[in-house]
Structures are given as C-alpha cells and as structure tokens.
C-alpha cells in the first residue's frame, strides 16, 4: 500500500508539532502539508524545524485548498471554528478528516455530520488506546451496576486548556450514559456551586480541574453504598494522541463515507 499523504492542521501548535514528530517516526504516512491560521506569525516556517526535527521542506500555509490537492487526509487538533472551516474543504476534496478538536458545539457536530454521506470522518474526544479502552470498560461497568451507584467523572488538565469538561470527559460520559441507556444531555450535572441541594438520582456528574502542565488525567467513579469503584487513565505525553490519530488516519484510507470513532478504529465495539 502506498504511503498516506497527510496534512497537519494547527501545525505550529503543541499538538501540531507532536503530529509532525509522530509522522516522522511512523511508517506508511508522510507529511505533505502544514496548515496554520491566516494571521499566524509562523506562516512560511518549516514544519520540521518547528517540531524540533531537521527541516523537511513543508512550509506552514493558510491555504487548505491548495495543500489538499495532493493529500489523502488531514489530521485536525485545532479549535472549533477552524475545524468547521476545514470540514467543507476536506469533504470537497474527498480526503479523510481525522478530528481531535474538542469544545465542538451541537451545531458544529451537525455540520460535521452533514458531510459524512460523501466524506470519511473519524472524530474522537481522545485518540489514545488507553482512554478508548477505559471508555469501553466504563460502559460495561455502567451496564452491570444499577442506579444505586452514582457516577462522577473527574478530569484535570494544564492551565492553558480553554474548554471544560474536556472532550475526553464527555467521551467517557457518553460511554457510561450508553451503558445506562440514558441521554447524557438530560442527565449531566456540571459546575456545582453553593447550595445545590441533594444529588439527583441518575445524574452523571462532571468536575474539571486546571493547573500546571498536566497532559490529561481522567477518573470515572462509581460510588455505591459503602463501596466505590474508580477507573483512571493518566496521559503522560501528548504523543499518545498523535500516534492514535495516525492509526485512525491509516485505518480511514479507503473506507466508505461515514462518521467513525476511535472505537471503530480499534475494534472496541463489542467490549
């Protein structure tokens, strides 16, 4: 099989640089384009140099249409506004779109869904193997325990993270909600403060912590009478997300149009 030619969106950011490094370490993929916002001071810089590698001749550009002319896919860990702009071009070009952007709204997700009749999209709040295994396990635990066990999800990230709860926390919330056969949107408790009253039965609670340089810690708590189950994942290096995204990109090549998740990529649907 020929190499998969990939564009990295947000190539000047932390995840973008991690993706550039991951591509350089991974067989079967090659960096063919580096996308940045039109007002970035990094436009024209070499993507390899920015990632701490030897220069690779791939210069940062704001023109996705031109970059995508000779690409097979785009890996996108940016911000919602940028991702939604990229969705239309990726679909028009017929290239796979791997989306790790978090903080997407209901309307953003509707835009993404609207192109999946003609485009391959893999979207996940977390691309790591460990977190997706955690989600599958948490779903199974939620199926096995009755609602006398309260569910709380606690996450912590670095001080610069701008959205809360994290995309990973929401991914875990969706997993346990599916296990309970309830709708997360109507059973989500966030931002408790002051005199809130007793906990509503059946709610899934979220707590978000921010500080330091924490890459990402997530714990799903099942709290029952006199006993508690805690399932935890701690990310120590964002390269796990980069390598997971490349696994998704290679998996997506040649797939039929549709919206896929990392559970599809990793074959976790039956766990």
From Swiss-Prot:
Keyword DNA-binding on entry: no
Q: Which UniProt keywords apply?
A: Amino-acid biosynthesis, Cytoplasm, Diaminopimelate biosynthesis, Lysine biosynthesis, NAD, NADP, Oxidoreductase
Tell me the GO molecular function terms.
4-hydroxy-tetrahydrodipicolinate reductase; NAD binding; NADP binding; oxidoreductase activity, acting on CH or CH2 groups, NAD or NADP as acceptor
Gene Ontology cellular component terms for the protein in this record: cytosol
Pfam families reported for this sequence: DapB_C, DapB_N
The record's catalysed reaction(s) read:
(S)-2,3,4,5-tetrahydrodipicolinate + NAD(+) + H2O = (2S,4S)-4-hydroxy-2,3,4,5-tetrahydrodipicolinate + NADH + H(+); (S)-2,3,4,5-tetrahydrodipicolinate + NADP(+) + H2O = (2S,4S)-4-hydroxy-2,3,4,5-tetrahydrodipicolinate + NADPH + H(+)
Query: Which residues does the entry assign to the active site, renumbered to this chain?
Result: 157 (proton donor/acceptor), 161 (proton donor)
Locate the residues binding (S)-2,3,4,5-tetrahydrodipicolinate: 158, 167-168
Principal location = cytoplasm
Tell me the route in metabolism or biology where this protein functions.
Answer: Amino-acid biosynthesis; L-lysine biosynthesis via DAP pathway; (S)-tetrahydrodipicolinate from L-aspartate: step 4/4
Write out the annotated subcellular location.
Cytoplasm
Keyword flag NADP:
yes
Binding of NAD(+): at which residues? Answer: 10-15, 36, 100-102, 124-127
Q: Which one GO biological process term can you cite for this protein?
A: lysine biosynthetic process via diaminopimelate
The Enzyme Commission number assigned here is 1.17.1.8
Q: What does this protein do?
A: Catalyzes the conversion of 4-hydroxy-tetrahydrodipicolinate (HTPA) to tetrahydrodipicolinate.
Tell me which family the UniProt entry assigns to this protein.
Answer: Belongs to the DapB family.
Protein name listed in UniProt: 4-hydroxy-tetrahydrodipicolinate reductase
Q: Which organism is it from?
A: Rhodopseudomonas palustris (strain TIE-1)
């Amino acid at each position: 099989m020929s190499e998969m030619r990939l564009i990295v969106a947000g190539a000047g950011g932390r995840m973008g640089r991690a993706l550039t490094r991951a591509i350089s370490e991974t067989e079967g993929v090659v960096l063919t384009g580096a996308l940045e916002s039109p007002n970035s001071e990094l436009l024209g810089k070499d993507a390899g140099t920015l990632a701490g590698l030897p220069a690779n001749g791939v210069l940062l550009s704001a023109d996705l249409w031109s970059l995508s002319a000779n690409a097979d896919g785009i890996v996108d860990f940016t911000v919602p506004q940028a991702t939604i702009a990229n969705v239309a071009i990726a679909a028009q070009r017929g290239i796979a779109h791997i989306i790790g952007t978090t903080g997407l709204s209901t309307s953003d997700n509707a835009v993404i869904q609207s192109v999946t009749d003609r485009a391959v999209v893999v979207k996940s709040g977390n691309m790591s193997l460990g977190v997706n295994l955690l989600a599958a396990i948490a779903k199974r635990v939620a199926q096995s325990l009755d609602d006398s066990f309260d569910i709380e999800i606690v996450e912590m990230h670095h001080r610069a993270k701008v959205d809360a709860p994290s995309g990973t926390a929401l991914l875990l919330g969706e997993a346990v909600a599916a296990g309970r056969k309830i709708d997360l949107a109507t059973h989500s408790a966030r931002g408790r403060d002051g005199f809130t009253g007793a906990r509503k039965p059946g709610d899934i609670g979220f707590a978000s912590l921010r500080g330091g340089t924490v890459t990402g810690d997530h714990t799903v708590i099942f709290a029952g009478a006199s006993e508690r189950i805690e399932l935890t994942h701690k990310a120590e290096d964002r390269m796990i997300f980069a390598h997971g995204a490349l696994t998704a990109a290679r998996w997506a090549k040649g797939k039929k149009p549709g919206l896929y998740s990392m559970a599809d990529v990793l074959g976790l649907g039956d766990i």
